[in-house]
């Protein structure tokens, strides 16, 4: 079995475009992956074209070899652009491997752990600007059976956050918590943009609202 083509599919969605990838083979078995890179799909497509040239003719079942060859292809690793494209391709390769063996991918990764997987809602707040509007949207989502809500209440703050912006964010979180009660989990998104002191400050301020998690408060390359 050999890789013959990698096809991208750009899908318009709320606030951004989703990018899906289909890896095709000479035996008719194909796999699908996803590697959306927010607002940068053209860069993603460029990285994907580079990967297609490198992967053409290879056996898609040699996932580890393909991944390491692509990752080590150049001295500069490519950061989130290349890694998003490589991630999408890797998903598709696992899909191909599972199909070729006649088993779901979770069996290849060690088998099933749970019979059901809980989900959370994102985008439920579309159009909301003020705390009261977020509360109204949250009530509507909870009424539809949603048990976990994720959103970023921090506006355009970057690295640090002003007292006014933090107060606005906390009022928003408070309004949502009051609207849905303790039975709905709140997942607060940071989008990896705060420095460590600010992230710690925000986390302490969020604690009274008992969020399930504070996601990506600092940049992914903030290793210290």
Regions found by a protein language model. Name each.
Residues 90-127:
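Glycine-rich, aromatic-flanked loop segments that form ligand/cofactor-binding clefts
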Residues 21, 27, 32, 62, ...:
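Ligand-binding pocket scaffold of soluble enzyme catalytic domains
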Residues 50, 88, 95-96, 107, ...:
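Alpha-helical scaffold segments in soluble metabolic enzymes
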Residues 1-32, 36-37:
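Structured beta-strand/loop patches that form or line metal/cofactor-binding pockets in enzymes
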Residues 26-101:
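Metal- or metallocofactor-binding catalytic centers and their adjacent structured scaffolds
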Residues 18-20, 88, 148:
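Broad gene-expression machinery/nucleic-acid interaction feature
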Residues 116, 120-224:
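Metal-dependent enolase-superfamily TIM-barrel catalytic cores that perform enediolate-based chemistry
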Residues 3, 28, 51, 89, ...:
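Conserved, mostly hydrophobic/aromatic
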């Amino acid at each position: 079995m050999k890789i013959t083509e990698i096809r991208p599919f750009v899908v318009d969605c709320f606030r951004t475009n989703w990018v899906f990838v289909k890896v095709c083979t000479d035996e008719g078995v194909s796999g699908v992956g996803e590697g959306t890179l927010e607002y940068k799909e053209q860069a993603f497509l460029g990285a994907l074209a580079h990967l297609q040239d490198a992967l053409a003719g290879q056996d898609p079942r040699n996932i580890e070899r393909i991944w390491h060859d692509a990752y080590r292809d150049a001295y500069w690793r490519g950061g989130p652009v290349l890694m998003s494209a490589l991630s999408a391709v890797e998903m598709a390769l696992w899909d191909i491997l599972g199909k070729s063996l006649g088993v779901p991918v979770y069996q290849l990764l060690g088998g099933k752990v749970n019979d059901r997987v809980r989900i959370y809602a994102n985008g439920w707040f579309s159009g909301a600007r003020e705390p009261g509007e977020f509360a109204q949207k949250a009530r509507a989502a909870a009424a539809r059976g949603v048990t976990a809500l994720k959103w970023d209440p921090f506006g355009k703050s970057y690295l640090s956050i002003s007292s006014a912006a933090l107060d606005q964010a906390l009022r928003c979180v408070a309004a949502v918590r009051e609207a849905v009660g303790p039975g709905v989990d709140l997942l607060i998104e940071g989008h990896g943009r705060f420095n460590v002191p600010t992230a710690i400050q925000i986390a302490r301020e969020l604690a009274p609202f008992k969020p399930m998690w504070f996601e990506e408060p600092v940049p992914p390359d903030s290793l210290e």
